[in-house]
Amino acid sequence: MGVAVLIAIHLHIRLSAEVSPLWRTLSEYVNAGAAPIFGVMCLALAAGSLALLVGIARARRGGAVPVLLGLWCAGLVVCGLVPVDADGAARTLSGQLHNGGAVLAFLSLPLAGWLLTRRSDAHCPWEPRRTTIRRLSVASAVTLGVVLASFAWIMSTGPADPVVTLGLFERVLFAVDLALLLTMTRPLLSSARR
């Protein structure tokens, strides 16, 4: 996951003049000539998340949580491999697949976090972080709602001159989801050290 964060920082610094962090989504780095780097970022995040999924499976947490984390990973892989449509361009199948992968990923992660922290036994490694994971899951879901509403607003009013800072909202969502992933991962690292 650290690789994904470093790549995201690199993209922001290198391409801030071409892709406004306030107005443009992370995926639009693809259209600024950074498709391979963006793809590696998504795939690195998926790989780190897959490691979390394996840790959860080893902790004997079955049910919907591994499935939802698998969907998060699959959505990230789609985002990394299938390019988004250029701003203002006609909608294509690949662009729709990219958008669908993003929605799938961003819907799945907060649900996984919420379900991971259901009350179970006292030896659950996530119990000490239950409140934090739940709060981050809610923050992720609320921020996703803002992102989707912003996207719908832009699509209905025209993307040429957006009045909604979709890029900023998506970056907040990305940061919240990274915090959620790290908070979900930390108990596994702590129990592995024991």
Feature map (PLM): residue ranges:
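Interfacial segments of alpha-helical transmembrane regions
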Residues: 1, 60-71, 128-140
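Membrane-interface interhelical loops and short amphipathic "cap" helices
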Residues: 17-32, 86-95, 157-166
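Interfacial helix-start motif at the membrane-water boundary
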Residues: 28-47
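Small-polar-interrupted transmembrane alpha-helices in polytopic inner-membrane proteins
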Residues: 67-80, 142-151
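Membrane-proximal helix-loop-helix units in multi-pass membrane proteins
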Residues: 78-128
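Terminal transmembrane helical module of multi-pass membrane proteins
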Residues: 118-194
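Hydrophobic residues within the alpha-helical transmembrane core of Major Facilitator Superfamily
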Residues: 9-11, 50, 77, 114, ...
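Alpha-helical transmembrane segments of multi-pass membrane proteins
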Residues: 2-20
